[in-house]
Regions:
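Conserved phosphate-binding/catalytic region of the ribokinase-like
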Residues: 212-319
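Hydrophobic anchor at the start of a short beta-strand
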Residues: 3, 63-64, 88, 171, ...
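Conserved phosphate-binding/catalytic loop of the ribokinase/pfkB sugar-kinase fold
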Residues: 90-94, 102-151
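Conserved phosphate/ATP/ADP-binding segment of small-molecule kinases
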Residues: 159-245, 252
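Glycine-rich phosphate/adenosyl-contacting loop at the front of the ribokinase-like
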Residues: 1-65, 76, 319
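Cofactor-binding loop segments of dinucleotide-utilizing enzymes, especially the Rossmann-like FAD-
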Residues: 8, 68-72, 106-108, 117, ...
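Gly/Ala-rich phosphate-binding loop of Rossmann-like dinucleotide-binding domains
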Residues: 58, 165, 272
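A glycine-rich helix N-cap at a beta->alpha junction
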Residues: 82-97
Length: 319
């Protein structure tokens, strides 16, 4: 079964400042702030929610289809997806734009200053779910039977949710950092046409505030509500009960960037393969735990056999 992954493709440029921002910023002069930080180290990572989710689903042996927009600078990313054998045929290139990118500077106290340029992501609405449906109906691998709408351009997120619903494709609504772009009634409209909803605990609180509904009430509007809680695992609200998903202690904590996307890759694989929520949630939890031990969102490279072995070690049964 193929999964259509709607969301962002982005570059993350990460720089390290060998000092503390606080030593360079004078509070009494904040109104005329003009600072420059020398950053001796810099690296560029492949990122973006759609790219990260697809990467993790691919590790598990799933069949991700990415639907996203990139800029004229996307050649390295597209080459990488080709090497990984991830379906990138529905990634649209906007030549006059840059691929979305985050430029992150971290100081020695782990404070961060981030600049985000959405670039081509703002044109995500140009992509149409119907085009994927038409193409995959003729593809030997078969049609997309599951989807996810992850953070992307606002109009793209809105339209892709409605297009998936109209196509009869069950999907996860994963608003993430895009959640503040929607008001309460808009969020409820998207939730009501989604099959599943995935948020972290902070986003869950914001969702409750904006909609005026408790998470339990929100859960009544979807087949399942998944709330991730970082090192505390996750809760799955389903069939009027809450399934607690235990965390998988990480061997070491290196970088949390992309852990939520790794979790969602596990969710999609479990749903693709008809697993129960106890198993699906545990697999998703494990994927997040594996990711956090590596720098960057797409640098962990476990084999499917290694993932299976770690799952059995952690939970005492196989998926």
């Amino acid at each position: 079964m193929a999964s259509l992954i709607c969301g962002s493709i982005a570059y993350d440029t990460i720089m390290n400042f060998e000092g503390k921002f606080a030593d360079q910023i004078l509070p009494e002069q904040i109104h005329i702030l003009n600072v420059a930080f020398l950053v001796p180290t810099m690296r560029r990572e492949f990122g973006g929610c759609a790219g990260n989710i697809a990467y993790n689903l691919n590790l598990l042996g799933g069949d991700p289809i990415i639907m996203a927009t990139v800029g004229g600078d996307a050649a390295p990313y597209m080459s990488r997806l080709e090497q990984l054998k991830i379906d990138a045929s529905h990634i649209r290139q906007i030549d006059q734009a840059f691929t979305a990118q985050a430029m992150i500077t971290t100081d020695q106290a782990n404070n961060q200053i981030t600049a985000f340029h959405p670039g081509a992501m703002g044109e995500s609405h140009l992509n149409q779910v119907s085009a994927v449906v038409a193409e995959r109906s003729k593809n030997a691998k078969g049609p997309a039977k599951l989807g996810i709408v992850a953070p992307d351009g606002r109009q793209g997120m809105w339209e892709h949710c409605h297009q998936l619903a109209e196509a009869g494709i069950p999907f996860i609504f994963d608003p993430g950092q895009g959640l503040p772009m929607f008001n309460g009634p808009e969020l409820l409209e998207l939730i009501d046409i989604a099959s599943y909803l995935a948020v972290n605990d902070y986003e869950g609180e914001m969702l409750s505030q904006r909609t005026g509904l408790s998470l339990a009430k929100v859960a009544e509007r979807v087949k399942a509500l998944i709330v991730t809680k970082g090192a505390e695992g996750a809760d799955v609200y389903v069939d009027g009960k809450v399934v607690a998903i235990p965390p998988v202690p990480a061997a070491k904590v290196v970088d949390p960037t992309g852990c939520g996307d790794a979790f969602r890759g596990g969710l999609l694989f479990g749903l693709e393969n008809g697993m129960d929520w106890e198993t699906t949630g545990r697999l998703a939890s494990l994927m997040g735990s594996i990711k956090i031990t590596h720098q960057g969102p797409q640098n962990h490279q476990p084999s499917k056999d290694q993932i299976s072995a770690q799952f059995k070690t952690a939970f005492g049964f196989s998926f």
